[in-house]
Amino acid sequence: MAPGGVVGHRLAFMEQLHDVVLVVDFGAQYAQLIARRVREANVYSEIVPHNMPVRDMLAKEPAAIILSGGPASVYVEGAPSVDPALFNAGVPVLGICYGFQAMAQALGGQVAHTGASEYGRTSLCITSAGQLLSRIPHTISVWMSHGDSVSRAPEGFSTLARTAGAPVAAFEDVERRLVGVQWHPEVHHTESGQTVLEHFLFDIAGCRPDWNASSIVGDQIAQIRGQVGDRRVICGLSGGVDSAVAAALVQRAVGDQLTCVFVDHGLLRQGEAEQVKNDFVAATGADLVVADESQRFLDALAGVTDPETKRKIIGREFIRTFEDVAKRLNADQPIDFLVQGTLYPDVVESGGGEGAANIKSHHNVGGLPDDFQFSLVEPLRTLFKDEVRAVGLELGLPEDIVWRQPFPGPGLAIRIIGEVTAERLEVLRTADAITREEMGAAGLDRKVWQCPVVLLSDVHSVGVQGDGRTYGSPIVLRPVTSEDAMTADWARIPYDVLEKISTRITNACPQINRVVLDITSKPPATIEWE
């Protein structure tokens, strides 16, 4: 089955088991955040494009529909619009920001250029709580991002709230179960935002809160057994949480029909290869084949400094190594399926969901050779990262694996700016291990999304160590906070923790005489340096 068919079948399977809330994506990054907030309320959600025909949306039998925000103005030629038929289908609908304005326009309300744009924190006054805003304080701080405003609600709708720049900041038609808000309840900066969403999901739409780690595990085990039957499966373990949880799910479903392959490319952090070989096997009982190919990867990377070339070489060598192992295993007993740890954001961002725009390619979604003769098993393809961690804990995986910070597939190779050598890898491993140890001791390891440690091996910085002048390389600390890695802010690490990290690194690594802190958000910078 083609990957698109796999995801379509898996999504349809979820729709049969749970109430589904469709999040209609109007082109901003808010759709994923809305979908995650719905799932935090224990309700299953899916993202669909704004140009999906209403009949196709209704074919999914949604319990509710949410129209997301977006960057367009309803007055711009070619701006996304909403088919009015959606509001006559009897399905509860919540419009947010642009979705609120498009909803108002489609139903005969008025959207105007008021000249009073609102961006960021804004004071909102609730004028009539209604059903949507019941039990919400009279005045709250909300997150706004709009230039146009609804100036008149559609006929039959009650106006619920206003701000200085939005005379109609929320409305509802209780009888038709149609509601909307100008602000972003899904953003953490909005006070009572999750409460507003849950009023819509439970009080207005009547959704069932049955989406949780236990139900996900049960659903996926049934799905995997139905797909695999009595045939054999192979899984490539990277040392990361995604592949570990995917493998553990398949192991729980089909037992010794699964063989895991760990390609040790020598580019992992300190202790991670041993963690895969020992802790994962002990927790799952999985059959593990280890291919130690560190020298092969170092030889292939010799003399290479361009980051994109590094990525391509590592990807090529990984696939070749994995294929070699798979062929040997397949010769003993045929293997039909390959497990991948693809996540739902990978699918959405790669345009592999339901027609979404292709933002970027992902190594889990594309990149496999055309002649790769396995059918894909992707048990995490409907899940966000926080759900993957919850499933990992439900399956009994060690916390060190479940809470492992995101780590790039090419490993430390793209955290060395310059040529990758055995000596540079050892220096970076030591600096990274010290950083992780001190962050953990300070209780920051789960508060920080990730903390890349980067070696600027081609930069030489003058220093004084002992009684002499040195020319060493700087180490960069890149701690960031994020929810999904699409955007990130630099993490405010206490100075005393930074001091300990810097002192320990420069003492342990004579090649390093300077430790610097990257305080750039994403955008404009990416999280990784290469």
Swiss-Prot record:
Residue ranges of every copy of the GMPS ATP-PPase domain listed in the record: 211-404
Classification via InterPro entries: Class_I_gatase-like, GATASE, GMP_synth_C, GMP_synth_GATase, GMP_synthase, GMPS_ATP_PPase_dom, NAD/GMP_synthase, Rossmann-like_a/b/a_fold
GO CC terms in record: cytosol
Annotated residues for binding of ATP: 238-244
CDD domains assigned to the protein according to its UniProt record, in alphabetical order: GATase1_GMP_Synthase (cd01742), GMP_synthase_C (cd01997)
Active site: 97 (nucleophile), 184, 186
Signal sequence bounds: none
Domain Glutamine amidotransferase type-1: residue ranges: 20-210
Record carries keyword Nucleotide-binding: yes
Pathway given in the UniProt record: Purine metabolism; GMP biosynthesis; GMP from XMP (L-Gln route): step 1/1
GO molecular function terms attached to this record: ATP binding; GMP synthase activity
EC number, as in UniProt: 6.3.5.2
Catalytic reactions of this protein: XMP + L-glutamine + ATP + H2O = GMP + L-glutamate + AMP + diphosphate + 2 H(+)
Any Pfam family the entry gives: GMP_synt_C
Keyword RNA-binding: no
Alphabetized UniProt keyword annotations: ATP-binding, Glutamine amidotransferase, GMP biosynthesis, Ligase, Nucleotide-binding, Purine biosynthesis
PANTHER family recorded: GMP SYNTHASE [GLUTAMINE-HYDROLYZING], GMP SYNTHASE-RELATED
Function per UniProt: Catalyzes the synthesis of GMP from XMP.
Name of the protein described by the UniProt record: GMP synthase [glutamine-hydrolyzing]
Organism annotation: Cutibacterium acnes (strain DSM 16379 / KPA171202) (Propionibacterium acnes)
